Every structure is written in C-alpha cells, then in structure tokens.
Amino acid sequence: MEELTIWEQHTATLSKDPRRGFGIAISGGRDRPGGSMVVSDVVPGGPAEGRLQTGDHIVMVNGVSMENATSAFAIQILKTCTKMANITVKRPRRIHLPATKASPSSPGRQDSDEDDGPQRVEEVDQGRGYDGDSSSGSGRSWDERSRRPRPGRRGRAGSHGRRSPGGGSEANGLALVSGFKRLPRQDVQMKPVKSVLVKRRDSEEFGVKLGSQIFIKHITDSGLAARHRGLQEGDLILQINGVSSQNLSLNDTRRLIEKSEGKLSLLVLRDRGQFLVNIPPAVSDSDSSPLEDISDLASELSQAPPSHIPPPPRHAQRSPEASQTDSPVESPRLRRESSVDSRTISEPDEQRSELPRESSYDIYRVPSSQSMEDRGYSPDTRVVRFLKGKSIGLRLAGGNDVGIFVSGVQAGSPADGQGIQEGDQILQVNDVPFQNLTREEAVQFLLGLPPGEEMELVTQRKQDIFWKMVQSRVGDSFYIRTHFELEPSPPSGLGFTRGDVFHVLDTLHPGPGQSHARGGHWLAVRMGRDLREQERGIIPNQSRAEQLASLEAAQRAVGVGPGSSAGSNARAEFWRLRGLRRGAKKTTQRSREDLSALTRQGRYPPYERVVLREASFKRPVVILGPVADIAMQKLTAEMPDQFEIAETVSRTDSPSKIIKLDTVRVIAEKDKHALLDVTPSAIERLNYVQYYPIVVFFIPESRPALKALRQWLAPASRRSTRRLYAQAQKLRKHSSHLFTATIPLNGTSDTWYQELKAIIREQQTRPIWTAEDQLDGSLEDNLDLPHHGLADSSADLSCDSRVNSDYETDGEGGAYTDGEGYTDGEGGPYTDVDDEPPAPALARSSEPVQADESQSPRDRGRISAHQGAQVDSRHPQGQWRQDSMRTYEREALKKKFMRVHDAESSDEDGYDWGPATDL
C-alpha cells in the first residue's frame, strides 16, 4: 500500500460568544515561519469545538482570502465580525493507495497513479447527493461533474494520450482546491451515482454546499499557450492576473480575461494525473442530467459573447445566488458563486424557444421550471411577468449581504396573481441583478418604474433561508466613511465628524416615532480606531446626507456653520464696516473655503464606501506638532533605509513650495516611508488619491514646557515656541479627524520619539479603511501635479505672515511680545526667533493705520506702547479727530476681541509649515 496525503476543504459558520469570541486561536501568516495561517488552539466549550481542529489551515474568512496574509490582518478581520463568521479551512488527510508497478516505457513518471492500466472510482462518501437544491450552473463541484459521464469518452477514461510533455514533474499528491479530491485508481470502471434528496418538512435543509474551480480543458495548437509550453490541459487555474479564481463563475472569468489588455498572467497547479480532462461523460439516455460539463461553457462564451451586458447597479456585477442551502450569514462572495447567465448561454435553441421572442430577456434567459428540473437545477427558479399598477404589492426584506426577499404580498395585487409568495428571493428585475443591491436601493428601483410598465422578475423559493434571515436579523452590511459633520439627535441619532467610519446594518430603518420603515434613516454602528464596534444608532441615508452636507457647506461659507463663532463674526464685521482691512479683503474672501469645501472640490461624497484592506506599500508619514522638524531629522538620520524626506519644488507662479505626488510614489517604490511636512488640506488630498498617510500629532503640555523641550532637543533652533504652540492648538481643534495617532510631549525625555517609531511600525502592519472603488484613470494621470481647485485652496489655507495678528494676552489683559519681528512689506519673509527685538513694538498688517510709503520702517504701521494714537501723515488736519476716535474704538475693542479668531480666515491661517506648505 502507498500512502498519499490529500487536503479536504471544510467551511464552518461560527456564532460569536460574548465571552469566548469564536473560540479559536490562530498563528502563522506571511510574517511568521511557515507562511500558512493555522488554527493553533480550539477553546473547549467554545463555538468552534467539534467544527474546527487544531492544525487546520485557514483559507478564507467571510469571503476574504487568507492566502499571503499576515496574522494581524486575519485577527482584525475576525474582530470586525459582529455575530457570525464563515471560516473555510483545509485539513490534511492520509489515504492508502494500492501498490502498482510503474511502466518501464515511461521513466519520467514519478508515482504509480500515472499508469494507464487501472481506472478510478469514487470514494465511499461520493453518494451524498450532488443534485442538492442548487440553482447554480457554475458553482458545481468537481465531484458533481465526475458523476456525469458523456458518450464517446468512456474508452478514454484511463488514457493519457492528451498529456503534454513534463506532466509528471511533480512527485507528490495534488492538494485540494475548492473541494476537488484526487481519487485513487481501482480496477473498477468509474460510474456516476445518482442520489435523490427529498424534503419531508420545509424547515429541513439539503446540507450540500457546492464549489467550483476553473481548469484548462483544451489547448489549441495555434494559440500562445501551445507555443509557451508552460501550460497543460487539466491544469487548475488558481489566479488570473493576480485575482483568485476560487468560486468564480465562468462569466466572471470571461470578463476578467477580457480586461487583461493583451497580457494574461496565470497561476496554475499541475494535475499530473489528468483527472479533470478524463472524466467519463454521462450517457444521454441515462437518468443523469444531459447538461454539458461546465467547462464547455468557456469555449461557447469565447465564440459567441452576448451583444450587450446590462450595467451593474453600482458595484461590479456579480453572479446570482449559488444554492438554496446557503446560510444567510455567509460571505456575499460565497453566496454568489453561481451565475444564471453562464448556465443559460449554452442552452439549445429548442429550449430557448420556450420564452417569447419579443422579450428582451436574452442574456439572463431562464428556462421553465420543468426544463430546469430536467437539467438538474432547482425547480423553484422561475420568471414572473406582470404590469405594474399604482403599487407593486410587495414588501421586501434582506439586503446586499443576504439578497432581496419577499416578506409580504398584498392580496389581489398583480404579484399575488402571479404566485409570488413570502420567502421568495428576487434574483433579477428587468435585466437588473438584485444580488448586490441594498434594501433601500431595491425599493427605490421598484418604485421608480412607471405604472403600466411590464415587469419581469426572476424569483426562487427560499423559505428556509428567509426564516433564518428573519431570525438572525441580517440584511444590509457595508462600511462607510463620513465627509461632513452632524450633531447628535437624541435619543437614537448619532453624531459624527469627518472621517468617522460606520457599519451600516439596515438602509430602511424606521425613524424615531415610526412603526414602519419609511426611508430616510440608516441603522449603523460606529467603528472605533481599534476596529471594534461602539454605539449603535441611526444616521441619515444617502440622499438626506447629501442635503445636509450641502447645507453645512453653505453655512460655513457665510460664517454661521459649525466651527464659526459669534465673536469672530462681530470682529470681522466691525473691521469690514470701517474699511480698515488693508489689502486683506481678497485674501480673506478666498480663505473662507475650509476642509468642507476642500472635500467638495476633491469630489468626496458625503458617505464613502470603504473596505478593510492591508497596505501593500510603505505609507507616507505626516508628522504634525511643535517638534515635527526635529522628529523628521532624527528618523532620516537614524534609519535612512526606511525613511526619506520628500523633496520640495518651487511653484512656477509663486515662491511657495510644493511636493509632487510623483515624489511620494517614487519614495514608496523604494520601500521607504516618505516624510512630509504638509497642510491638513494636503493630507485630505493624499487620502483622496488613496495614499493613506500615517498622520502623527504631537500634543504640547504647555508653552513653557515646549520651550524647554525644544531648547534641550535643538538648542540652535530659532523658531518661536509661541507660534508653534498656537499652531498646535489650532491643529488639534480643527484637524483632529485626520490624526492617525497622537503623542503627548511630557518633560524633556525622548519617550515621544520611541513612541513615534512604534506607532509607525504598528500602523504599517494594521489594515486600513480604503475606498471600495478605485480611482479613475484621469486622476491617476495627473498625480504629478496638484489638482487645480485644490491647489488654489491649499495656497489660501497656507500660512501668510502678513495677515496674522501678533498680539497675545498673558492672562492679565496686557499685551506682550514673544520677540518676533515681522516685515510688513509685500510678501517678504519673517524672522521667527525667541530673542527680544531692540524695539518693543509689533507690526500688524491688520492695523487700521495706513502708513505712507515714504515713511521710515520704524514709523510705518507701529503703535507705541505709551502713545494712544498716531496721526497719519497723509490725512488732513481736519481728520485728526476722526482718526483719534478710530484709535479709541480700536483700543476699546482690542481686549474684547483679542482671543477671537477672524471668521474670514481659514483653519490653517497662521500656521508655520516650513518649506513644504502645499501638496
């Protein structure tokens, strides 16, 4: 006897225990020895006991492949599972093969399975029922196809004449892929086995889950594959252009290959025994289904592609439901592994004639119940047609996570007359698939159809799945990131700021005081920074969010929205009425556009669909706070192989500095972190182009402590601690939604630096919320240049020393200076030092006194600490009293408005960003 190790694939649906979780411990991964993700422990009495075993290799979690994933990524995926998790594992199993002698004429063969003599038979557990209750055409397993022999190929069951050279290069057994088992050869002809499963009660399940795997059935002599000699007939295709082919339908595979643009990359697994290409066909007059082997659809799809494909409702089009036995909590990818169109394209013409020719239902043509039953499919899938009246008469349940189901039928409605019942799943309406639609989108689509229009519904009876869905209260499931601010509305309305992430569970949740869902609200759960779910409540739906975001932008534009203050409005109005804002009108008018306007310019929707992914590149690092310059220098000096400061370039139309996005990309290609010194608006830009920077903010303890820390770290630095401290306070107030992590600055130790390095290492390995949809090509083509509208906004939001006030109060009401001298010329640089200047006066560009250009710099724009007013030399003597009154008014209001920021200035006004002020 010869021993052979095979891999069996199992899928377990685990319910989360409040105390034990899922009851498993995992180890391994790409970053650990061995590489495979394995179950290292099973908690006794936990949800996984008896279902998973120690040593199981984890293949997939909730439809997310664990191949090449790190252990941290797998742990975070499991943490995001709220109630249930669908875990697919593969388990090694040893079988014994009868010893056979190798053929002397075939020295290249490595083991006894390669002999031509013996034939193969099914294992003893093969008769567990391949028919099941599946509606799948492309989701059938290899075991199912192995039981369907066809005429004309029975004599070739053991032949290897179609093998290509080198087919026996691998010595060991073939691992399982999606349920495929390599069967030992016996002296008995392999025969199909028919199994019939009959439900005694509606609550019973067939208990069969079908899978699929794409393989190479035939290689033409004139194609590139024949000349390449790297592919052979029977090879299992594991990846197509880097995308896993597991559970892909043939129609999805065809679309994937069509997008290859002349270059096709395949990762294959060699089938040395040529098992798949030598499956005996079923006899046409037998009881087995006469449907062709599923792999034959590949040639038909390539020869006669459909004339048109209906566009998906929002996301990439996926396949309809796979099986009536699917669990409602399974991953959408596993539930949608079959395809209606892939099984109907290959129908004979005599079967297609059953539907009227005038129907436009060509691609998704579904045969009658009788023909589907004859072909081995579920008899429940059928087509229903009726004219829409004033109402459809259907109540819908479910969502994008489980599918759309009928939860109620109005008596006497057209739908009731066509036999639609509670528990029917709606697969398609008027050529539009319903598999990926939320409940709100499905209802809006049906309500949007005009009365009198003919409706064509593809439905399937799934009462058992429907009742499971109702009991488990599942339906919609997707994640969003907010891009506007909303105040909480008690008792159940959640508030949020820009950048918050929510898990949406129901898109038609009843609002406060409503007994039935009327739309307008979503049930959502806030996701914390640790990827754990927090409080649950309702948020506005998509259309309502767009209205609120537009209203917020309009309010902030006039200075009455969130973040504005009455005092700042009064101060701005006071100076505006007296015409004393010298040369600042244009600047302040442009600088009204804050981050909300930037979000609108960046084409962010109010809600952005996001998914949790692991970064495949070194993310750029943005360090904000009063010691950012010191931290960047220390990182590049200590670890030059991991960090690099992004180079700045000058604008062509202004002396300001910018960083090109192409510079960030080049540094990432070097496998380094790009260190950036940019504005919050530039951070928004980086997030929009999906660079997802790690933003670390240093929180100063106090201004004296900050001054002592900078003198200890950089004694030669001449930067003003007053300005750095004020800048940090503004950043913390207006841009905290952009921070990835914060580090307090306490004392004069270097613990902040060690914590910074630890945060960067941790954040690089953690999964991040990324946009569900990729960027369009037009934006990627212009990454080397700043966005036009964004560049203008960024320039307005950067620091301009000419419009900043230099007065501060020390708590006693008096004015003092931190020793900074400013030039009030036309854009000249300012000096920012902690040494006191020779004169105890400050230059303020916002002062109402207009200086004559012929005056000396000492006299121009200065106010003596002991002099009440200064007469403008350009004014006539008759205006001295008016100027004196203005000076008196200014002095009277100075204390009142000293600490209030001008509403006309942006959140970034007054920031000292260094050479890189824009991105």
Curated annotation (Swiss-Prot):
Q: What induces it?
A: Exhibits enhanced expression in matured epithelial layers. Apical leptin, Staphylococcus aureus alpha-toxin and Pseudomonas aeruginosa acyl-homoserine lactone 3O-C12-HSl lower expression levels, altering junctional integrity in intestinal cells.
Q: What is its main location?
A: membrane
Q: Name one GO molecular function term.
A: cell adhesion molecule binding
Protein's UniProt name: Tight junction protein ZO-3
What family does the database annotate? Belongs to the MAGUK family.
Locations of Gly residues compositional bias?
812-828
Organism of origin is Homo sapiens
Bias class Basic residues marks the residues at 147-163
On modification after translation, the UniProt record reads:
Phosphorylated.
Q: Where located?
A: Cell membrane; Cell junction, Tight junction; Nucleus
Q: Which residues form the PDZ domain?
A: 11-93, 195-272, 380-446
Q: Which gene encodes it?
A: TJP3
Q: What UniProt keywords are attached to this protein's entry? A: Cell junction, Cell membrane, Membrane, Nucleus, Phosphoprotein, Repeat, SH3 domain, Tight junction
Can you quote a single GO CC term?
Answer: nucleus
Q: Which GO terms describe its biological process?
A: cell-cell adhesion; cell-cell junction organization; establishment of endothelial intestinal barrier; maintenance of blood-brain barrier; positive regulation of blood-brain barrier permeability; protein localization to cell-cell junction
Classification via SUPFAM superfamilies: P-loop containing nucleoside triphosphate hydrolases (SSF52540), PDZ domain-like (SSF50156), SH3-domain (SSF50044)
**Which residue intervals are annotated with compositional bias (Low complexity) in the record?**
791-801
Q: What does this protein do?
A: TJP1, TJP2, and TJP3 are closely related scaffolding proteins that link tight junction (TJ) transmembrane proteins such as claudins, junctional adhesion molecules, and occludin to the actin cytoskeleton. The tight junction acts to limit movement of substances through the paracellular space and as a boundary between the compositionally distinct apical and basolateral plasma membrane domains of epithelial and endothelial cells. Binds and recruits PATJ to tight junctions where it connects and stabilizes apical and lateral components of tight junctions.
Q: Where is the composition biased (Basic and acidic residues)?
A: 117-131, 332-360
Report the residue ranges that make up the Guanylate kinase-like domain in this protein. Answer: 580-761
Residues with PTM Phosphothreonine: 325
Q: Residue positions of the PTM Phosphoserine? A: 112, 136, 164, 169, 203, 319, 327, 371, 591, 856, 905-906
